[in-house]
Amino acid sequence: MKKLLFLSFAVLIGLASCQQKGGSNTTVGEYFAPADSGVQVAGIKMVSIQTPVGKFRVWTKRFGNNPRIKVLLLHGGPAFTHEYLECFESFFPKEGFEMIEYDQLGSYYSDQPRDSSLWTTPRFVEEVEQVRQALKLDSSNFYLLGNSWGGLLAM
């Protein structure tokens, strides 16, 4: 009986100490809005790109680590996804290649603008260039591997 009384008293003390402190001015939308801290989680980094209609973010994911051989994979589409290129995750890093998957604007994990003026080949080519620069890829360490539409952008 004494143990039950002590346990009840401990629970009441614990509950009494749980009080909400001053409210926050943060809205629900602000709380859940994604913030890019620059930290890469599981190799993922959102890259900001500038377009004629504003800034957007595109998704990238890095596998492996090789300062001299980095391969940026360009998927087909436009507006297809990186998913069918995921098979390279099992091969490239094992062979010493660093690879970077990326979803072009309007694709899967990247922003989805509704402005049809963005869907031009020169704008997508400029996007690849902005991604290249943001990921610090240059002629000494960087290769493009594009499939279908991605091959057109790579040329």
What label would you give each PLM region?
Residues L15-S17:
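C-terminal motif of bacterial Sec signal peptides marking the signal peptidase cleavage site
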Residues V53-F63:
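A short loop-to-beta-strand scaffold at the N-terminal edge of the catalytic core in hydrolase folds
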Residues F92-D111:
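Conserved alpha/beta-hydrolase
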Residues P122-F142:
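Conserved acidic catalytic loop of the alpha/beta-hydrolase fold
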Residues G146-G150, A154:
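Gly/Ala-rich beta-loop-alpha elbow adjacent to hydrolase catalytic centers
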